[in-house]
Structures are given as structure tokens and as C-alpha cells.
Amino acid sequence: MKTLIAAYSGVLRGERRAEAARSENKNKGSALSREGSGRWGTGSSILSALQDIFSVTWLNRSKVEKQLQVISVLQWVLSFLVLGVACSVILMYTFCTDCWLIAVLYFTWLAFDWNTPKKGGRRSQWVRNWAVWRYFRDYFPIQLVKTHNLLTTRNYIFGYHPHGIMGLGAFCNFSTEATEVSKKFPGIRPYLATLAGNFRMPVLREYLMSGGICPVNRDTIDYLLSKNGSGNAIIIVVGGAAESLSSMPGKNAVTLKNRKGFVKLALRHGADLVPTYSFGENEVYKQVIFEEGSWGRWVQKKFQKYIGFAPCIFHGRGLFSSDTWGLVPYSKPITTVVGEPITVPKLEHPTQKDIDLYHAMYMEALVKLFDNHKTKFGLPETEVLEVN
């Protein structure tokens, strides 16, 4: 603004000097020299003003981009936490209003469509390609690293580690096209598996299905691996709620030793196992960790047992400032590395020995994947993956 005022003042001074020269009509050479000097000074000031305007515009654009990134992340966090409950309350309320017909129509549709999530849902490439997901990706940023090709003639079960608080890397990489998963693995259809209870929530279920998210239960996985052709990739966050309870910055630990159900499913369908590790997933939120035996951990375990998820006391940054607490995750890089597939035979009735063998192979492959890539993403060579 100061530069613009200076430029405008320069224009006025130049015009006054020129007018004085014409009226006095004395030294023509001197007058022409002064007029030329005024014009060059004015041009220089205007150019400087324009440069300042462009630089301010660029800075403002940068700030707008950052705020759009924050908003895009916050909308997903709020959807994850409250959309289902909020929509349930709103629909129940409409029964008591003149809009009761809307609720009746929706619940009629819900009854008709109840089993759709179990058959892979209704993915929408339009939703998966929304621009909001690119802002979501750039906020952290999030990237997907491919180490090996996947055959479209095979089906796969990806074990995703660690869970983190919300599994933000899993969502961005496999339920949107922000990191171009379909281009990196052409012909492969990713299905991120999450709690079946989410699909009993009105509106939220439609939102989840549009991204290719499905319930993490046996019926759904059996259907996708046996009746949906080949080229399917089921992404299972193996550690689940138990792993989220120990999520904290600086910690690389997975809950895996006693998680063998996904291996049994892979054997029954002959689906290859793919170890997947997300570096930085635990860095984006801080939470209160309750020690084993404490009342807080007791409450969390009861929730986990009867409801399927464990409530966490966590925080990120505020909406307008990174110096305040809020629900927006911290802007920390998340890099998801997809490892080499482990070829699994199809055994209709796998024995415990078979399950233990391929589970051990999977654990070994996951640790190897972690060790091969840890130094590339800021971890020291001495960092060890803790397998619980």
C-alpha cells in the first residue's frame, strides 16, 4: 500500500513539473530533461507497485491453500467422529416435524439397501477423485510408495500397520485417488475394511461406501475374495483398536503376534498377503496413554470388548493455529510403503500349522519392509519395529 501511495505521488510530482515547464517556457532543454526524468521515475514506481501487488497476491493464495488443506482434513475427522450420530439424531427428529416423510423414505431405502456394504458397497470414482482429497493429501503430506507390481489375476489382503488414531494414511491412499493408487496398481480394486458398526449409521454408510470402504467381517471378505472376480485388494488394519491405544509420536509398534484371522482368510481363498507399513502414522496426534491396570485402560478395554472400538483421549492442533489444541491432526509426513506380496496357496480347511507358518512369514516380511525403508523417512538405523 505504501508503494502504491509513493507511485501515485510520483505521478503527481511528474505532472506538476511538466506543467511548470510548459507555463514558464524558459529553458526548453532543461524542461524536456525534467519531464523525461519524471516519466521514468513514475514508470519505475508503478512497476515496483505492481510487483508488490503480485507478491501479496501470491502470499494470500498460499495462505488460502493452507486453510483449504486444514478444512479438508477437518471435514473428514468430523465425519469420522460425529457424522453418523449427528445424521441419526437429525433423522429421528424429522419424524416429529412436517418433514417426517423424508425420514420414512430414507429408512425404507436403508432397509432395502442394508446388505449392500457386505457386497463391496457402491464405490464412486467421482467421489474418490474429489479435489478435497488432494488438499487432504498435501496437508501432511501423504504419499504411497510401490515396491512391487501386483497381478490382476490374483486377489490380495493388505495388512496395514500401524493403526494410529484414525488410520489417515490408509484412508487417503486406498479410499481416494489423491495418491493415484489406481495408476500405481492398475487393474487392482482397493477395499479399505473398517468396523461394521459404521455401516449402520445413516448417511455415513453412503459416504464410506462411495470411497470403496467395506465392513471388516468374514461375510464381506468372503464375498469379495470369492464372488467378485480377481484383482481385489482388501486392506485390513490388523492392529485395530488395541493398537490405537498405544499410538503416540516417536513409537513404532504393531499389534500382530496374536492376530492370525487375516492369515486364515488368505489361506481359505488363496489371496496373497501384502505387508504394508505407514511411516509417520503415529506422529499426527498426541494422546493420553493409560497404563495397564489403570481405571482408564479398564474403561477402554470394556468399550473395545462390547462396542468394537476403544475411546482415546487425543488432540491435534487448532483450526486457526498450530499453537493451540484441537481436532486437526498435526502436519507430519505420512508415507505408506506397500511391500512384496507373499504367495499364499488356497486351502479350504487350513490347519493351525499352516496358519502359523504363513503368519510367521508375514511378520518376517513386515519387519524386513520396515528395516529396508526406515532410514529413508527420518528414522535412525538403530530403530527397531516392536511387534506385540
Curated annotation (Swiss-Prot):
EC number: 2.3.1.20, 2.3.1.76
Cytoplasmic side: 1-69, 113-388
Transmembrane feature ranges: 70-88, 93-112
GO biological process per UniProt: cellular response to oleic acid; cholesterol homeostasis; diacylglycerol biosynthetic process; diacylglycerol metabolic process; fat pad development; fatty acid homeostasis; glycerol metabolic process; intracellular triglyceride homeostasis
GO cellular component terms given for this protein: cytosol; endoplasmic reticulum; endoplasmic reticulum membrane; lipid droplet; membrane; perinuclear endoplasmic reticulum membrane; perinuclear region of cytoplasm
Induction details: In white adipose tissue, it is regulated by leptin. By insulin. Up-regulated in diabetic mice. Down-regulated upon fasting and replenished upon refeeding in adipose tissue and liver. Down-regulation in obese animals can reduce hepatic lipogenesis and hepatic steatosis as well as attenuate hyperlipidemia, thereby leading to an improvement in metabolic syndrome.
Xref: Pfam families: DAGAT
Membrane topology: Multi-pass membrane protein
Compartment(s): Endoplasmic reticulum membrane; Lipid droplet; Cytoplasm, Perinuclear region
Catalyzed reaction equations: an acyl-CoA + a 1,2-diacyl-sn-glycerol = a triacyl-sn-glycerol + CoA; all-trans-retinol + an acyl-CoA = an all-trans-retinyl ester + CoA; 1,2-di-(9Z-octadecenoyl)-sn-glycerol + hexadecanoyl-CoA = 1,2-di-(9Z)-octadecenoyl-3-hexadecanoyl-sn-glycerol + CoA; 1,2-di-(9Z-octadecenoyl)-sn-glycerol + (9Z)-octadecenoyl-CoA = 1,2,3-tri-(9Z-octadecenoyl)-glycerol + CoA
Tissue specificity of this protein: Predominantly expressed in liver. Also expressed in testis.
Pathways involved: Glycerolipid metabolism; triacylglycerol biosynthesis
Molecular function, one GO term: retinol O-fatty-acyltransferase activity
Activity regulation, short description: Inhibited by niacin.
UniProt keywords, alphabetically: Acyltransferase, Cytoplasm, Endoplasmic reticulum, Glycerol metabolism, Lipid biosynthesis, Lipid droplet, Lipid metabolism, Membrane, Transferase, Transmembrane, Transmembrane helix
Lumenal side: 89-92
Phenotype on disruption: Mice are lipopenic and die soon after birth, apparently from profound reductions in substrates for energy metabolism and from impaired permeability barrier function in the skin.
Annotated function: Essential acyltransferase that catalyzes the terminal and only committed step in triacylglycerol synthesis by using diacylglycerol and fatty acyl CoA as substrates. Required for synthesis and storage of intracellular triglycerides. Probably plays a central role in cytosolic lipid accumulation. In liver, is primarily responsible for incorporating endogenously synthesized fatty acids into triglycerides. Also functions as an acyl-CoA retinol acyltransferase (ARAT). Also able to use 1-monoalkylglycerol (1-MAkG) as an acyl acceptor for the synthesis of monoalkyl-monoacylglycerol (MAMAG).
Entry-linked PANTHER family: DIACYLGLYCEROL O-ACYLTRANSFERASE, DIACYLGLYCEROL O-ACYLTRANSFERASE 2
Quaternary structure (record): Forms multimeric complexes consisting of several DGAT2 subunits. Interacts with SLC27A1 and this interaction is enhanced in the presence of ZFYVE1.
Similarity field: Belongs to the diacylglycerol acyltransferase family.
Record-given protein name: Diacylglycerol O-acyltransferase 2
